[in-house]
């Protein structure tokens, strides 16, 4: 977190220089922030003194929060920010073990944040009291990128969220729509396999990170914009912007931790300059696609086309009262969530399997046993009996949840959880990474053991749609990721075919223990190093 803070300050200074503001060029931005922070601290102290004249009422939010378990190493102004580390979900899990195994309070700058680290409390927050914790805290960055948080992921709870959520779950990501995309999935899988086949013939390693990212990105682009997705290199531009979004939405932004700074126009302009430039690029790209679709609809040229997401949104625009900005926000959601979850799960699955060849061999045998002899590739008709395949995917999601810290929740009212009262307007973060490695629920919790999902114990009954809260690959409740059907279909189709068509080895000279498992944190998690594997036709 210290490195992220330094980077954030550097970004602010860089943006100021780009804007050619003489004052900011003359004064280091950190010095500019100091009086603002001191002013903030003085105002907070004054407000606290006024509030504490006489006995504090039982409903006082600060008093209620002070009763929660909390690490003692809180510093002036920054609070517990210095404890977050470069990989926050790992740091938070370690802190929870010492100071709050179920839930704990962190003061992140000026923002009190409750961290949930046990399945029992996760169930209380995401199921029992889901109606209380179903909102989102506001963020300048997500407000800009998502057109005032009018998408379905970052929108605060209310009528617009319910409308956007219904639109996405009923019309875009329902099981029927996912089934209708099967031909596109099979075509994109075939294209990826052809790339691997050529590498195998040349005895060259394959950059699996690039291959899998490209495969999922192309598939999402087709679902969103149909045959327009490949024109003018749009699929590559979508991928570039999606990657930038992930960094921005998961990055450290000082105004999120000191909200009063975010009210200062100068800070808002400088801190969010890059975000506004990225939004402009999204505008240019999405406006062109929407205009193309609208023109075809007006002249009935679309009647024989597959009904991609843009077509569906335009056809429902009046019924749902959607503005153009609403449509663009929902489309960005589809790109962001649809790409990262699937490709990262595929990459982590291949990484874990190459480190345990006996598990890869077992999976290959199952896949090849379930496909008729001579069949070119695995089809979705062959998948139902592949229990090892499903176990590998579940275990990958347990160890490497794509969103290790679920997007923050925000309490709409005061609520008692695990014997503590969480006040209204409190940020709550569920550490999905910690749940998946909770030693009270999992044996050998830090090991890749897919067979745990084949047994008759608790783990064997866990599904991607959570019934037990020790495994939250896609979240839960009103805010559960609606793309579970699409992600499952994409991951199963690709992983099964990689196992069916090829045998895999590490590049010459590498051993399993040489594979770097270092992760990089953003709004989603990724591997630091590319995965290079050598294929051989089976």
Curated annotation (Swiss-Prot):
Its EC number is 1.14.14.153. Heme binds at residue 481. The keyword Transmembrane applies. It catalyses: indole + reduced [NADPH--hemoprotein reductase] + O2 = indolin-2-one + oxidized [NADPH--hemoprotein reductase] + H2O + H(+). Its main location: membrane. It is a single-pass membrane protein. Keywords: Heme, Iron, Membrane, Metal-binding, Monooxygenase, Oxidoreductase, Transmembrane, Transmembrane helix. It holds the Pfam family p450. GO terms for molecular function: heme binding; indole-2-monooxygenase activity; iron ion binding; oxidoreductase activity, acting on paired donors, with incorporation or reduction of molecular oxygen, NAD(P)H as one donor, and incorporation of one atom of oxygen. It is an enzyme of class 1 (oxidoreductase). GO terms for cellular component: membrane. Pathway: Secondary metabolite biosynthesis; 2,4-dihydroxy-1,4-benzoxazin-3-one biosynthesis; 2,4-dihydroxy-1,4-benzoxazin-3-one from indoleglycerol phosphate: step 2/5. The chain crosses the membrane at residues 22-42. SUPFAM superfamilies: Cytochrome P450. PROSITE patterns: CYTOCHROME_P450. InterPro entries: Cyt_P450, Cyt_P450_CS, Cyt_P450_E_grp-I, Cyt_P450_sf. Its cofactor is heme. It is found in: Membrane. Catalyzes the conversion of indole to indolin-2-one. Belongs to the cytochrome P450 family. This is indole-2-monooxygenase. It comes from Zea mays.
């Amino acid at each position: 977190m210290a490195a992220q803070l330094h980077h954030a300050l550097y970004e602010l200074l860089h943006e100021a220089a780009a804007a050619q503001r003489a004052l900011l060029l003359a004064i280091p931005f950190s010095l500019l922030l100091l009086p603002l922070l001191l002013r903030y601290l003085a105002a907070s102290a004054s407000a606290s003194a006024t509030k504490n004249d006489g006995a504090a009422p039982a409903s006082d939010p600060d008093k209620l929060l002070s009763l929660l378990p909390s690490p003692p190493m809180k510093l002036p102004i920054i609070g517990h920010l210095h404890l977050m580390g470069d990989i926050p979900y790992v740091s938070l899990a370690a802190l929870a073990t010492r100071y709050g195994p179920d839930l704990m309070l962190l003061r992140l700058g000026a923002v009190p944040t409750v961290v949930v680290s046990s399945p029992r409390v996760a169930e209380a927050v995401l199921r029992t009291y889901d109606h209380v914790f179903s909102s989102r805290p506001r963020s300048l960055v997500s407000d800009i990128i998502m057109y005032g948080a009018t998408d379905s992921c970052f929108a605060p709870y209310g009528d617009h969220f319910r409308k956007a959520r219904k639109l996405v779950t009923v019309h875009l990501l329902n099981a029927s729509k996912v089934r209708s995309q099967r031909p596109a999935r099979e075509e994109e899988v075939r294209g990826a396999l052809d790339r691997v086949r050529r590498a195998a013939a040349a005895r060259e390693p394959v950059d699996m990170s690039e291959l899998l990212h490209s495969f999922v990105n192309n598939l999402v682009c087709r679902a969103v914009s149909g045959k327009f997705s490949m024109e003018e290199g749009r699929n590559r531009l979508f991928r570039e912007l999606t990657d930038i979004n992930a960094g921005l939405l998961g990055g450290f932004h000082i105004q999120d931790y000191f909200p009063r700074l975010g009210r200062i126009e100068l800070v808002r302009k400088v801190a969010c300059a890059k975000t506004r430039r990225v939004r402009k690029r999204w505008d240019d790209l999405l406006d062109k696609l929407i205009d193309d679709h609208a023109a075809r609809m007006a002249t009935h040229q679309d009647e024989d086309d597959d009904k991609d997401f843009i077509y569906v949104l335009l056809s429902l625009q009046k019924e749902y009262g959607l503005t153009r900005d609403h449509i663009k926000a929902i489309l960005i959601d589809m790109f962001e969530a649809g790409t990262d979850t699937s490709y990262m799960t595929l990459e982590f699955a291949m990484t874990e399997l190459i480190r345990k060849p006996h598990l890869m061999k077992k999976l290959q045998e199952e896949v090849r046993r379930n496909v008729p002899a001579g069949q070119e590739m695995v089809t979705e008709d062959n998948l139902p009996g592949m229990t090892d395949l499903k176990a590998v995917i579940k275990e990958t999601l347990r160890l490497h949840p794509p969103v290790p810290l679920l997007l923050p929740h925000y309490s709409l009212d005061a609520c008692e959880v695990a014997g503590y009262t969480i006040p209204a307007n409190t940020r709550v973060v569920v550490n999905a990474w910690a749940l998946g490695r909770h030693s009270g629920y999992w044996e050998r919790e830090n090991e890749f053991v897919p067979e745990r999902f084949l047994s008759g114990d608790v783990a064997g009954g866990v599904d991607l749609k959570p019934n037990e809260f020790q495994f939250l690959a896609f979240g839960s409740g009103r805010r559960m990721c609606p793309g579970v059907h699409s992600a499952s279909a994409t991951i199963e189709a690709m992983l099964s075919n990689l196992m069916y068509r090829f045998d895999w080895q590490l590049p010459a000279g590498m051993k399993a223990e040489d594979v770097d498992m270092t992760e990089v944190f953003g709004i989603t998690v990724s591997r630091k190093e590319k995965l290079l594997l050598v294929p051989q036709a089976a």
